[in-house]
Amino acid sequence: MSSRTLEYTVPPEKDGARVRSVLQGYLGLSAGLVTRLKHRPGAVRVNGIPARTIDIVHALDVIEVDVGDARPGAFAPAGPALDVAWEDEDLIIINKPAGMAVHGRSDRHEPTVGAMVAAYLGTNAPFHPVNRLDRGTTGLMCAAKNGYMHERLRRILHTDEFRREYLAICVGVPEQAEGVIDVPIARVGEEKRFGVDPQGAPSLTRYETLLTWNGLSLVRARPETGRTHQIRVHMASIGCPLLGDRLYGRACMELDRPALHSSALRLIHPLTREIVELNCALPEDMVALLPGKK
């Protein structure tokens, strides 16, 4: 079993505190994760000695906690090679290919992003995607390597510490070259379809038209919320569905998927405070649709 150990020296003001208090208040572990650690012998140590979460610690005591969640066992074949854009001990950012689901169904034997990451890391640990991408969407996608980092990243996902940009090719030209689409989204019926609904979840997307040609437009979209199919639903709501989007627009011969690409990602690393800023070029199938490329 692989591990990821965090270390913390108790400051004078926490003298007499319980281990649980330090883990939650200073290291940012959730109550659920602390509870799970209680059932893993040796996961928490104070000055090198196994400790309980209810134990008292004193100033200058060193607390070590293993937040790794890898487990032994075979992992499924991954399929295509993983395109890694950035990684460290706690997180990995990949360039996701088109036509691949993040998670697989038990009745489908097909490559998934989760299986690709498992094979790359050589582990059968739980997969922790942070910004999920639809099957047809390409580009930058972040995943945590352990449950602790997943919790930390999810807390900042829709804040200024985790910003995402997408490029989309739309059918039609937005009436306003740039703007904000601020309309709620909800599931429509029993289908895997969503739509604008006054009773739905608040949803906001900022967009900017970069290029127009032959009734199409290249749009940069910045979602500030994370609803399922948000950009697809929002662009369709202003009369500009994504090219190739069978669900919210119509199919096309040029592209067999929605023309959507996760093109930029900027985050502040929850542990190191390093600024991670990445850009990802348009995939070939979208580049081929731009003016002058045919």
Predicted regions and their residues:
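Pseudouridine synthases involved in rRNA/tRNA modification
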Residues: 1-37, 82, 198-201, 211-214, ...
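RNA pseudouridine synthases
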Residues: 1-180, 184-191, 259, 285-293
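Thr-Gly-centered strand-to-loop micro-motif
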Residues: 46-47, 103-104, 144, 196-197, ...
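Short histidine-centered loop motifs in beta-beta connectors
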Residues: 48-50, 214-222
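Short, well-ordered beta-strand micro-motif
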Residues: 64-66, 220, 266
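Short Pro/Gly-enriched beta-strand edge/turn motifs at strand-loop
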Residues: 65-67, 188-191, 202-204, 245-251
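Short flexible coil/turn linkers enriched for glycine and charged/polar residues
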Residues: 88, 135-136, 162, 201, ...
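Long C-terminal interaction/binding lobes of large macromolecular proteins
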Residues: 207
